[in-house]
Design a protein with these regions (language model features):
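Basic, helix-initiating cap at the start of DNA-binding domains
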Residues: 1-26, 30-39, 56
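Short alpha-helical elements of helix-turn-helix
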Residues: 13, 17, 45, 103
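HTH DNA-binding helix-turn interface
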Residues: 25-28, 41, 48-64
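Hydrophobic alpha-helical connector segments
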Residues: 60, 71-101, 146, 150-154
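Amphipathic alpha-helical packing segments from all-alpha helical-bundle domains
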Residues: 67-70, 74-76, 83-86, 115-141, ...
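Amphipathic alpha-helical segments used for helix-helix packing
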Residues: 97-119
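Hydrophobic/aromatic-rich alpha-helical bundle segments in the mid-to-C-terminal region
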Residues: 118-123, 140-192
Length: 192
């Protein structure tokens, strides 16, 4: 999932920055292109020239959000101790500490129909997290099936904690889910 941000003009970058803040803070459906254009200091025509449609702008927002989060995630992985899969909780907790409206991808999934042009960015983000967790769990689990199963458990724990974090602005669910994941990952591998 790569964005075209490097090829964006300064005006397009500003539009994307403003739209990202508004979509996350107020919700995708609550924010119109008039508001985005006005707060970006551009005309609607410029917005449409740069992105083509609000749907394409939403997709760009989600791709950008993924890249920023992924960068933070990989930085944490690089310095983590075993089991490194637990850093997923820290990465989401860091993100949630900076913002308190929950997961941008879960929020977008709640607003967008599955056939929306931007929905694939949601699926790609969640699948990338799931796949990376499987790689990290496999570092400590030689059996690929067991590693995949445990990674799925960790993924579901973190997803549930993310949703709960967005509901009540508490870190407790994330801490509890992390403890459960540690218990799962600290158990002896199942003999095959």
């Amino acid at each position: 999932m790569k964005s075209d941000e490097l090829r964006l003009t300064p005006g397009a970058r500003r539009i994307l920055e403003v739209a990202s803040q508004l979509f996350y803070r107020d919700g995708i459906h609550a924010v119109g292109v008039d508001t985005i254009a006005a707060e970006s200091g551009v005309t609607k025509r410029t917005l449409y020239d740069r992105f083509g449609s609000k749907d394409a702008l939403v997709a760009a927002y989600l791709r950008r959000r993924h890249e920023l989060w992924w960068q933070q995630f990989e930085q944490r992985i690089a310095v983590a101790e075993s089991p490194r899969a637990l850093v997923v909780f820290d990465a989401y907790l860091d993100d949630a500490t900076m913002v308190s409206r929950g997961c941008a991808f879960v929020n977008a999934a709640a607003e967008l129909p599955r056939d929306h042009a931007a929905y694939s960015a949601i699926r790609e983000h969640k699948q990338a997290v799931r796949d990376r967790l499987a790689e990290l769990v496999a570092e400590d689990r030689p059996d690929p099936g067991e590693a995949r199963r445990l990674a799925e458990h960790v993924f579901l724990l973190v997803e549930g904690a993310i949703v709960h974090r967005g509901l009540d602005d508490s870190t407790q669910p994330m801490d509890t889910a992390r403890d459960i994941a540690r218990d799962l990952l600290d158990t002896e591998p199942i003999a095959t």
